[in-house]
A protein has these predicted regions:
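Cytosolic catalytic headpiece
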Residues: 2-167
Length: 167
């Protein structure tokens, strides 16, 4: 899907902070994402922009393929990634679940940022559809070719995008 149906240029649509001290946690989120190899990490760093992470000491960082990353900052464990990965660290509140469902309806990829103390932020990332995608898929279907879409996105997000282009 990425780069074929969509433009392959992910951008952060929004960050919903669940903690009143967002100014404290934004530099930590930036520091972790600067060290990530995930393709969406640079979109998050760009969105946060001015969050100064130079003083943040990150230790024990490791990435779990397809799930997210975990690290320690000032003795506290943090995670960024899929909801299933985050829920192993801390429970997901009804408010967070509602945010995840909203993101899926919008066709966004959702990433959660959490500490052992709870979910700190919901990050919604989108990638614009290529203007030619729907027409190209329709043309293939008219030629009798069955079109399927492969994606690492969650089922709800994938369904939204597939419906938008006629798959």
């Amino acid at each position: 899907k990425t780069g074929t149906i969509t433009e392959g240029k992910p951008r952060v649509a929004s960050i919903r902070w669940y903690h009143k001290e967002a100014k404290h946690y934004a530099p930590i989120l930036t520091a972790l994402e600067e060290r990530s190899s995930h393709p969406l990490a640079s979109a998050i760093v760009s969105y946060l922009g001015v969050a100064d992470s130079s003083e943040i000491e990150v230790s024990s960082l490791h990435e779990v393929a397809g799930q997210g990353l975990e690290a320690e900052v000032a003795g506290l464990r943090y995670r960024i990634g899929r909801s299933t990965f985050i829920s192993e660290l801390t429970p997901l509140t009804d408010e967070v679940q509602a945010g995840l469902e909203e993101g899926a309806r919008l066709g966004a990829t959702a990433s959660l940022f959490a500490s052992e103390e709870g979910v700190l932020a919901l990050i919604l990332i989108t990638d614009s559809l290529r203007p030619s995608s729907k027409a190209a898929i329709t043309e293939l279907q008219h030629k009798g070719i069955e079109v399927i879409m492969l994606t690492g996105d969650g089922p709800a997000s994938a369904k939204t995008i597939a419906q938008a282009v006629g798959i």
